[in-house]
């Protein structure tokens, strides 16, 4: 009964430590923002800088006091397929003395850029459920405040396949007191059919001037309904803008936005009124999007709550976007930052570069991801072939070669993150479009950075070994050969042999034994083993630290999230989590083995490393990754139990499930209680509370299986992957059986007594694989934990089987390198 009580105490200890760490993180998450916002702030109406108030003309004050009950009207001038690079290109042609046919367009582009410099220019992410956003999709999304499709995936963007709604959530949220007027037939997808609601009694106006004559609070104009080229769109937008500036009511707030990107997916032009504010302030002269956490970037779904907030003074939680705060009136030339010509040009150039960066990331992410996974698979195949019963004279050379290649490939995930600090996306770019060479440059640069990471880790390992050398010389520890000889002299079945202490048995751990005999410290690790461990640890360290500071390197990364896909803009993405978790499992198991094993070590290492990773990944103000937290808690519990040599019964699995729900629920509560708009974790908690989460879960489930149902090529690829995985598992089971029977062609990799290399193929009866050190259990435990991680990650994340590929890419090289380096150091 005593060992069973120890098991129960250990399990309770693991649970208490994890819960304590999560509670501490929650307290910090709540108290931190509260302390940061404790300083008194001016009311929203007084938040404008004093320089703005001093520069307001007297007419603005008169206009604002003219009618306190009626907000200043808002005019939305919409176009499509227009980027900052397009405007800069047309304006540069005008400056270069282009032909007279394009001179008018160049002047129009100049005027639009000047208008943007006086306002708040931004990039607009217009992603909808499809890979490209048709104009009809954009209008329907604007009306619903959620991503929506008006055009079937296989249809063209010529016209909507969805019926025009009678009313829309946008019009309903505005209420009956806010009148709406539109120009262009496509706008009905955003506002509903004429007469469908009390505030839409009039039909679609035939022209901008007639719409302005109606003096509605909200006027939405489709300026690109008759345009098909950049020049035509720019000219039409400029004409509509001039008309609004001349004929609209004083103080009218003007929004310019390109809503669709069906020609070249990527961030679009958006200009908000000067003085527009965000809860996240500004950065580099650009408004930080509240939903994106990125400077100068907002989403199409943010426009809907922004309009409702500006005109109706309310915020509807049914909308997915986050509202920006428009100024009370339109004040031309008064922005939240310096609007000099040089500053305005710098802001526009930065936005154009950010859009180019996003497009280059989208073009690179599939190639870089496939390369990373392919290299991991190739490494495993090469290692299996090269290390299979080689000649005795080549064994050590092959071992070292495979080990260092694995160490190098283990550095690639970190390198692909760090390479984003250099402007690789600008190589060969032209007219706002990335070059095909940019992807190659990113990969080559990452290869060089990976070499630097390995070199740095090797230098640190050499320094550590040099510092430890005098101490080890003063009190030498037993050599690995002596340890192996001592293990070999124990009779088979002795209680001191590892075979008698199998994983199913529960015996006191090395650091808990009551034997009076002195325990031996683990032999010093060689430089290769320490280098491999450091390179593997760099993966979770780099990606999690980057996520904690806002993901400046992961956003628009060759491997990460970008503004084109627009699935996530901050925190820990699915790709980042797969890389982090895969490497983290290997690192925790490797560190535990270095510390000599034992239950206390398992608890300590998992609680510190795993708990820290869980806090960063799940905290709403850091990683905000609900799927990652759901995956990490059971995986860490399984890993701890495996390292501590404990058996998880179904009751303990139920307890782990309850703890997982508790941890994720705690993160959601923190998200809802902290100041500002909640992240998607908090919104999902609200949806669970009001019963609308079924739709979200359905969409995620479809995202998991949909590609394999609708695309035959994806189904064929999945079938091939299943066959390959099944073959690999069959081969692995055969090798494990041969290893246990002493007939494995890889038996020479095992540490042996007196440093002798056994013969393979069953010709040597006393195989060393029967008497390996208990520390060898860490490899088996890590493999099983990676299996749990992969299974749960695939099921709870909408990236699906892609998660398995990135887990393999991060874990396989690291695990192989540590295993081979460890066996070399033990010889």
Where are the regions a protein language model picked out?
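Membrane-interface helix caps and helix-loop-helix hairpins in membrane proteins
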Residues: 617-626, 795-802
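Hydrophobic membrane-insertion alpha-helices, especially the h-region
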Residues: 17-29
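Hydrophobic membrane-spanning alpha-helices of multi-pass integral membrane proteins
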Residues: 406-416, 445-451, 537, 604-614, ...
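Transmembrane catalytic cores of multi-pass membrane glycosyltransferases
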Residues: 314-320, 327-328, 337-375, 537-577, ...
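Core alpha-helical transmembrane segments of integral membrane proteins
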Residues: 347-473, 518-563, 575-596, 600
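Long, compositionally biased intrinsically disordered regions
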Residues: 650-658, 662-667, 678-686, 690, ...
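Soluble extramembrane regions of membrane proteins in the secretory/endomembrane system
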Residues: 36-51, 55-361
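Membrane-interfacial, low-structure loops and terminal tails that flank and connect transmembrane helices
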Residues: 389-403, 464-529, 735-777, 781
